[in-house]
Amino acid sequence: MKKIALAGLAGMLLVSASVNAMSISGQAGKEYTNIGVGFGTETTGLALSGNWTHNDDDGDVAGVGLGLNLPLGPLMATVGGKGVYTNPNYGDEGYAAAVGGGLQWKIGNSFRLFGEYYYSPDSLSSGIQSYEEANAGARYTIMRPVSIEAGYRYLNLSGKDGNRDNAVADGPYVGVNASF
């Protein structure tokens, strides 16, 4: 029974991902960079995403997320979770299972506002006390498939066992996004 349920879930995910658009993005802040990829992140239904954030002083974070996009009038809400690998420069590498979501508001054909928040407490984290990620910004489509974006990203790995916190990202960024 478990194999059938797992095969059904995997099939739904693959069907949803193949129908919906793929997006690739890159952002650069003053002291960090972020690279991301997503399947179905701009349409209703299942969405799969992944990203890698790097900071020379505070370490690396890589994550894979699964969400469900739901229409709410002019907004699209996402609820879901992320599996995150953490490698802080000050502390032990580990993982976090974060839960959260986001909102997108498409204004016209070219402009979109967005925000998201994910959190993992100590009970769902290893090597860190907690994981916290927030991102908010605006995206303007220059010419499909290319858009530019600007926003603010905060990603913090709270220290554990006497290790200090590692703010992998904390500041404004600019970026580019391509959706196919």
From Swiss-Prot:
Pfam family, one: YfaZ
Highest rank taxon of the organism: Bacteria
The name this protein goes by in its record: Outer membrane protein YfaZ
Keywords per UniProt: Cell outer membrane, Membrane, Signal
Main location: membrane
Disulfide bonds, paired cysteine numbers: none
GO-annotated cellular components: cell outer membrane
SUPFAM superfamilies with a match to the protein in the record: OMPA-like
UniProt xrefs under InterPro entries: OMP/PagP_b-brl, Porin_dom_sf, YfaZ
UniProt subcellular location: Cell outer membrane
Signal peptide coordinates: 1-21
